């Protein structure tokens, strides 16, 4: 589908992954509507792409406001006509390094409003319009490895990403998701450490190979290659397999399993047999 992507909407498009996605689509010839609450930065980045010859529209929008998101959807369909890709990408890091009881409630609420509530609003505004048109389309939710792996002092961010993962899973096109049997595919993007302004000053995670961080352009490449496919989980960092295995191993250790029945034994013990010698008279 990426070769047929003619129109895309990207939220959180003023910087980081959102900007990289917008640039990837625009440089491939697609029309792009870029949305962000940071209007100044958004319009500067859009102007840079337009100077390259891109077909870009910048829309300043508070994505936590239902009316603003509805206006964004109306503008996007008016400007682009049919839309092939919606990247539900707006996000903030919020407070990190603090235990839950020290995080100001207003800050935690803000993180949930941007990382979760805004994604719900975008899905509610765009998906019905995509279904009405009946054409193939792809909805990309940007979650995080923090939707699976949680560290100390990350309650607000990790909890909001867990919530967004749940929304994406409820929407997915294969059973039992809400979009089963439709032409709208859903994927959830789960990057690890990405070198963007949002994480400047934070310590990069260390893996077996050292620093496992990637660029925003690397992440955009993962999304580009997945467009039109049935891939639901999109991982961008080399340490993802190890981190996921450790997480699910930890879960599995706490699952109370009943003793297997003989039919379920993976390696059943062979039954003992007694040889009988027959004597034949001649």
UniProtKB/Swiss-Prot annotation:
Stored PROSITE patterns: ADH_SHORT
Positions bound to NAD(+): 12-36, 161
Region Disordered: start-end pairs: 258-282
Catalyzed reactions per annotation: 1-deoxy-11beta-hydroxypentalenate + NAD(+) = 1-deoxy-11-oxopentalenate + NADH + H(+)
GO MF entries: oxidoreductase activity
Binding site for substrate: 144
Regions of compositional bias (Low complexity) in chain numbering: 267-282
EC number: 1.1.1.340
Active site: 157 (proton acceptor)
InterPro entries: HdxpentlteDhPtlF, NAD(P)-bd_dom_sf, Sc_DH/Rdtase_CS, SDR_fam
Keywords, in A-Z order: Antibiotic biosynthesis, NAD, Oxidoreductase
Function: Catalyzes the oxidation of 1-deoxy-11-beta-hydroxypentalenic acid to 1-deoxy-11-oxopentalenic acid in the biosynthesis of pentalenolactone antibiotic.
Family: Belongs to the short-chain dehydrogenases/reductases (SDR) family.
Protein name: 1-deoxy-11-beta-hydroxypentalenate dehydrogenase
Species for this entry: Streptomyces arenae
Gene name per UniProt: pntF
